[in-house]
């Protein structure tokens, strides 16, 4: 774990870079296991309706659960606090193509991030569209081709497969713009651009990203970015000045910060094995529970398809830090998880 002070020290670190790949790829050892259970058969689906790749999950203040998933098409489902299906939001929406994330803000507005349409859509608690950031690639004839190459060319004036959205206490919007542009962008609450961090190209230095895959904002307005390809979490203040790097979390696919006076950071460590025929099968599967300063409280879970195991966690709702909703890509499911924390010493 590395820390940076604001101002000249941060600039010096940026210029010098971080030496030593072992430092960047450090993994937490001797982390205590947190006892937990998965609630069996929690979600009650309508006949012939199933989850696909479960990309995002979020709860509102009433405890209703939103699941954003994709099979042949992208769909957003709402469930009541007991897991009973309520309704589908925006079926066959122009903004739905390849789901990536759903979040609920402090006013119970529902936001979806679709990496296929490059759109972030804000909806009222009743389901009315209030704001759209980004634009779906359009063509007069046929389909717009996805940018090719490794890495693909950046799309700095547009979103390039965005991945997540979050807000600070003032309502400013932060978007991780993810697979192509490798940056985080800050907008005001009305959607006006303020600033961005990231070089628009993959990089491993501080202030650079290799697929910023998820983000979360704490009560002080600090932004925690899951820099998945670099196996770290970069922490920025509200002006997107680097404050710390946590490199003890493995391969972070998802981050979530719980509300309340004592906030916790949850981070999923998913490591698909590219050498297997099913390259998306997770071989780690654990979720870390952390203090906001990067100390690890404990971890739970392991890779697998059984109840209480995880296959590539892509979404975590931690509105209640002892009762999580966890969505998985490879297992095509969503689990309700109850933690039974024990008193432990945090690990750095």
Protein language model regions, located:
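Bacterial N-terminal signal peptides
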Residues: 8-17
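Hydrophobic membrane-targeting alpha-helices
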Residues: 16-19, 289
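Bacterial N-terminal signal peptides that target proteins for export
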Residues: 1-9
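Eukaryotic scaffold repeat domains enriched in small/polar residues
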Residues: 23-348
């Amino acid at each position: 774990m590395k820390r940076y002070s604001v101002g000249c020290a941060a600039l010096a670190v940026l210029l010098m870079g971080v030496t030593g790949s072992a430092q960047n790829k450090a993994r937490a050892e001797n982390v205590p296991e947190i006892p937990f259970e998965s609630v069996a058969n929690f979600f009650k689906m309508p006949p012939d309706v199933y989850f696909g790749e479960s990309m995002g999950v979020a709860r509102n203040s009433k405890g209703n659960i939103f699941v954003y998933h994709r099979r042949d098409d992208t769909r957003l489902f709402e469930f009541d606090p007991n897991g009973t299906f309520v309704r589908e939001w925006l079926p066959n929406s122009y903004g739905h193509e390849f789901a990536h994330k759903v979040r609920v803000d402090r006013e119970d507005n529902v936001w979806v991030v679709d990496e296929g349409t490059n759109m972030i859509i804000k909806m009222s608690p009743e389901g009315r569209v209030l704001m759209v950031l980004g634009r779906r690639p359009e063509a007069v004839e046929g389909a717009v081709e996805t940018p090719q190459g490794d890495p693909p060319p950046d799309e700095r004036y547009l979103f390039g497969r965005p991945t997540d959205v979050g807000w600070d206490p003032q309502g400013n919007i932060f978007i991780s713009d993810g697979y192509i542009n490798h940056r985080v962008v800050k907008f005001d609450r009305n959607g006006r651009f303020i600033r961005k961090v990231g070089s628009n190209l993959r990089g491993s230095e501080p202030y650079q990203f290799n697929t910023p895959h998820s983000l979360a904002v704490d009560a002080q307005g600090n932004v925690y970015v899951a820099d998945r390809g670099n196996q770290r979490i970069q922490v920025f203040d509200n002006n997107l000045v680097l404050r710390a790097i946590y490199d003890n979390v493995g391969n972070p696919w998802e981050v979530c910060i719980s509300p309340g006076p004592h906030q916790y950071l949850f981070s999923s460590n998913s490591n698909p094995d590219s050498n297997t025929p099913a390259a998306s099968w997770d071989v780690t599967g654990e979720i870390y529970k952390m203090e906001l300063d990067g100390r690890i409280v404990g971890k739970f879970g392991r890779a697998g398809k059984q109840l209480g195991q995880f296959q590539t966690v892509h979404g975590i709702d931690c509105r209640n830090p002892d009762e999580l909703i966890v969505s998985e890509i490879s297992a095509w499911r969503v689990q309700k998880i109850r933690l039974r924390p024990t008193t432990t010493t945090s690990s750095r």
